[in-house]
Amino acid sequence: KNFHSTAVSDEAKANALTLSKKTRIIPNFIVINENISFIPNNNFLFIGRNENRKNLKLFINLSKSIDETREFIAITNKISNDDLIKYLIDISDDEKNSIIKNVGFFIAPQTHSESFGITILEAINAGNIAICSNLTAFIDLLGDSGIYFENDNLQSLLKVLNKLNNSDLDKIWNQQYEHIDKNYNSQKVLDDWIYVYNNL
């Protein structure tokens, strides 16, 4: 009772210096797409700024290590010197939403300083399987439904992708989708906020 502050995740709470001891975790939310299914495209998507911690470099190295029939798309703020990636620079939300529905796999290779991961939820909600570095924030976000590789480790990522080649991808995506529907749907998060306001 009498919560004085909120945070979107345990990781955000741990990194904050000004929160009171009475802090409730209330995550970000998304509007769940109820008319979506796994997209059986074997392409890869990265979303994030072209800066070290977002680790576009690993995504580029992945593109050099995989069958050339796969398409690699990066929605980012500046182009790197690599012709295997299709770069989409500072596109609109509508353009992003159109692209994200036609990929298959979302790669989240960030190396540090992540407190949540809303783009991961958006990707799953658009019919993609999310494959994430094993940051605490991402493990907290997806729990047992997540597909993880060792932080900044290309060989670990390739091993995970190779294992997925022999897996039931529909089942994996459904587990991720059900997880985000249960934990991050707008009504659930709204109920959490109402609870906090009622306990001020």
Regions found by a protein language model. Name each.
Residues N97, I120-N125, T136-D140:
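Short alpha-helical segment that forms part of, or immediately flanks, the ligand-binding pocket
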Residues C132, G146-Q155, L161-D168:
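Conserved acidic donor-binding segment of nucleotide-sugar-dependent glycosyltransferases
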Residues A74-S98, F105:
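Nucleotide-activated donor-binding/catalytic signature segment of Leloir-type glycosyltransferases, i.e.
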Residues T6, I30, I36-K54, I60-K64:
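Conserved donor-binding/catalytic core segment of Leloir-type glycosyltransferases
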Residues E11, F29:
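Carbohydrate-associated surface elements
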Residues T111, N128, C132-L142, N151-D152:
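Short glycine-rich donor-binding/catalytic loop of glycosyltransferases
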Residues E34, R53, S167-L200:
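A charged, aromatic-enriched C-terminal amphipathic alpha-helix characteristic of glycosyltransferases
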Residues K101-S115, N128:
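Acidic donor-binding loop of glycosyltransferase active sites
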